[in-house]
Curated annotation (Swiss-Prot):
It is found in: Cytoplasm, Cytoskeleton. Keywords: ATP-binding, Cell cycle, Cell division, Coiled coil, Cytoplasm, Cytoskeleton, Microtubule, Mitosis, Motor protein, Nucleotide-binding, Transport. It comes from the Eukaryota. Pfam families: Kinesin (PF00225). This is Kinesin-related protein 10. Residues 417-503, 726-802, 891-971, 1134-1156, 1191-1238 are annotated as: Disordered. The gene is kif10. It comes from Dictyostelium discoideum. InterPro entries: Kinesin-like_fam, Kinesin_motor_CS, Kinesin_motor_dom, Kinesin_motor_dom_sf, P-loop_NTPase. Residues 417-436, 726-795, 918-934, 961-971, 1215-1228 have a biased composition (Low complexity). ATP binds at residues 116-123. Belongs to the TRAFAC class myosin-kinesin ATPase superfamily. Kinesin family. Residues 16-374 form the Kinesin motor domain.
Amino acid sequence: MNNNNNNNNNKTTMNSMIVTVRIRPESQSEILNKNCKTIVRVIDDNMLVFDPNDIDIGAFNNNRNNKQSQQPVEQKYIFDRVFDQYATQEEVFENTTKELVSYVISGHNASVFAYGASGAGKTHTMVGGINTGPGIMVLTMKELFSLIEKDRSNQYIVSMSYLEVYNETIRDLLITNTGGGGNSNNKVLELCEDENKQIVIRDLSWEYPTSADQVFKLLKYGNLNRKQSPTQTNQTSSRSHAVLQITVKQQNLQDKSKISFGKLSLIDLAGSERASKTLNTGDRLKEGTSINKSLLALGNCIKALGELCKNQQSQQQSSNPNFIPYRDSKLTRILKDSLTGSCKTIMIANISPNSSSFEETHNTLKYAQRAKSIKTQITKNVFASSTNLITQYNEIIKEQREEIKQLKLKLIQATSNNNNSNNNNNNNNNNYFSNSFGSCGNKNQPIKQPTPPTSLFHQQNQKYYRNDDDDDDDNDQEENNDEVLINEDDEEVDGEDSNNRDNDESMIQQLEEMSLLINSNLQDTLTLKKTQSIQRQRKRELENELKSLEKQQQSILNENNNVDIIKRTNEIGSQILKIKTLESSINEKLEMNNQWRRKLQSELTLKFVNSPKNLKILIQQARAATLELDRFDLTERMIDDRSKLNLKTNECKSLKDSLSWMFGILSDGFKLLTENNLATDDFLKDFLKSGDLINNLDNSFIINENNDSNNNNIIENDDIDLSFNNDINNNNNNNNNNNNNNNNNNNNNNNNNNNNNNNNNNNNNNNNNNNNNNVPLNCNNSNSNINNKNQNIINPSPLKPRRIMSGSNNIIKSTNSNSRMTSTATTTAASTATATTTTIGKEKKGEIRSIVNPINKISSSTSLLPSSSTKISNTTPLYSRTSILRKRTLEIDDSTDSNPRTKKINVSSPVVTKPKQLLPSTTTATTTTLSSPLVNKPKQILPTTSSLQPKPHTKIQPHKNNNNNNNNIAPQMNMNIQIPNPIPIPIPMHVQIPISNPIPMPSPSSMNLKEKLDSLSQLCNNRSAKNENYNHNNSFNSQNPFVHPLQMHPPQLQLPLHPPQTMIMQSNMDLKMKLDSLSFFNNNNNNHQAQNDLSFDYGQNTLSNENLILHNKIASLSSTLINQPHPMRVKKLTPTSTISSSISTRPITTSTTTSTTVPSVVSNRIKSLVHSNSPIKENLYKEKLSSTASATLTPNRNNSQIVQPFKRGVLGNGPTSSSSRLLPSSRTTVNTSRKIIK
């Protein structure tokens, strides 16, 4: 049959492989096993979800040992068609193979193969069963012969073969030898290729069925010969691959020169097996090995074909573009035409929905997904008629003509007998049937073997050659016989109608009962799920409340309410226990309903197999119920996932804020350590790593300054007035900067030396040297030119100061701000040292944090200070801690009376802006001015006017130098603080707030050095005095005066301050820093050089007796204060690197008497700070130097105030944490009296 010349010139078309998935119903053992769950959920006709995260049954474990340790995979797969557990054999056939039958008859090749693991339902799909009905093979042959019978214009020859591949050997299943397919007596067949490179199997038998019944008998016989053995996973496991090949030859009766040829291959593959799961040994193990080998080769071919098709689509070239490993197995060689030939292929992937077959199902879905990308070229097979075939047909025609003549003679004899005798009706009826169907009368006669389908041609040709006279005789005969047949049929119909009625009534009753059961199961399950959802929500609320109560119970602030907390905790525990009991009962009922639905999937088709219409109705109802339950589960899951996502988002946000806050403290410590030459290489490396981690934490941390510069919001706020004059040094008397737009960028190195400089920027076209991008800044030396981000400085009206959110800084400048920045500073760095600006976080709108990351070891002197003024009221919003790198050109006044001169130095240093906090409110308001030499930290408290009202603005005047030996003074930071009513809100430790009567402190400019030393001596001598009026109820733990910066509270928390009336005073360490500063201020023109201890070398013949006495006095006071050597070891301190003191504009002298008690812990702490080599030494040392020890003041009856230092207040906008405490560091009693001096 294959020796035909192929003259096919038809066009070829590309067609993708059709991939479908069928999910089998679960077995009884799988349903009863509580450890196994359903892991496949059908969404619609084209999509399924593998291993879903079901809420009611929990996430299933996708590992081999069924351990609930891994999260569900939840992979979504889309195929050409997905059949759920309710799908019938007819439904699968109609949506897969039915269209292929007409496709094959028209002269094309097609193949259908079932792929899957052992026990997944492949044989059930292809062959069928007694209870479930026939499979695809049987239904396909029925459809084929029905189409052939309907087509009267063509002649057809149908042939079939049935073989198996067992242990890599090919066996014929239709042979008549005894033993069957598994017997060794069967002949092993060989594969070969013909001249057209088509696969041919030698000695394979071909049968020529003439009806579907003959095909059923042949299939039944072949399946009995097929090798099957029971295994651990399947009692009727197929141990071989079965291939049913059907060829159809078509010849047009009008044009007999054209013959089309079509081939349909139906393949039932054996299932892949896992030896550890099947527990096979001996022959079963050998069979499983061969099966897995051939399936692996098939999988490799599918994978290679998929990659080849992808490369062809993308026009890419692979290493082996044309190599497909067909020869790895005999199965792949047989399926070569089906995979890559001119063939339309349909793959039916059979999977199990149970979790016991997790890996097998997952692998099957992956191979099916790959097979979707395979494309084949489809060509119609049309052959020219050969001479041998024509002669064969001529012989058939001759035989048919002879038969026609014989039949005509018989017909004549029969008609003559009918005229003679009218009583032989039975004989006439037989003659009628023989004359009507020609070849049926000769059905028992043998037919010559190369032409088995002759009966089909004979039936068709007989109809064409019949005479008209015969037709008339037959019509008369039909009228006589119809009366007899009708009478007999009426009697049979009456009996059958009564039986059918009874059957229909019982069937309808069963249908109604099953429909009610499905509906009741759906309603009951939905009610239980809704109740379960409500109880889960209630349980979460109670658990959250329980956690908050446990935190309150651990806090010392709620000792009085412990009884109520314990009572409420017990109530919540009992409620949670009841909810858990109710949930367990609900889960049991849900499991019972789920088991009933799973059983229904397999029992439904068995009960109503004889009534397909009723079966379809019930299947639709069951699918609708399943879809409703899935929709409810998905809705609940979406709600649950959304709540979890919001919770995680808030946690991530708080963690980011905490990390940014902690890194801000670390950057401050780095600044102080590098300024004092205490930073080690390990610390610098760790600091760089932490900076990179913070920078790469999230893209949301990085601010797009292009957007910020174009969207700078001007916020009118009467409560905040912050002025920073750091970037532009204007030596002016009147400097009016009117910036009506926020997109004005100024040059960092801009020095305006004009007396009147009016800058009116009313448009957006101000182009400067600065770009609004996060560009790293490289500083190779101290004189490196860096273009940094500028600020938009405005000059609002005196009544309504405005707050500008500009780029990375919040700038608000009050009216008539006349200032002159004259500072002394120097920066020294190694020649290879560099610094980069790293953007680490977005604390609030328009704020950015930048730090200097040194790559090599950097040594520098003390930082340069900005001039700032702050005005805060009771409605002040919280703001965040920022550390901003600024490039400044400072004017250094390095002049004497004889040699006046100035220097300009480019300096890059981080300027720390301290965090906002809500301040306690009072009925009266005071104004205080604070200054700091190192960071923006309070140093002094200045008295206010008698009106106790805040000034609308402050004036920062240049320092008036009354002493020739005084050097350039650092600019002063003034803070106008309007104090509202007292409320228990924490105050940062760097802010000093008097409550009712402000404490007048001496101004450095109004006192000479002797008066300063006298007052400081009095403070140090009285520090051992005890405070008898100390209120112990307001005290806190004082064993830890110094706190590591990373142990401080994150910005989103706030601690309540007890008692409500608070005041912050300076610590002993701050006082010591003041003594050291005074020593530097008094002698910085004499080229001082600091030694390792507190002894200073003032040079030769440059120190007067008076200064020497003062120096000794300072040293003794310092050592008395701390009882330890000074921790700051500065080497080679130059005159331009000294710390300048802050000068107040109001000469006020105050006599102060202070009694201070310093615990011994302070001394030990400083020892550990100085001599320890721990990695946190720098941070602790920074805390000691830069932070002012806070104190709490409580009014006393003796008109004295108790100072209680505590740990730095927590930053940010969070709720109060009851578990945190404010720890005191020392107790100080201050008696003050004011004396105003002109």
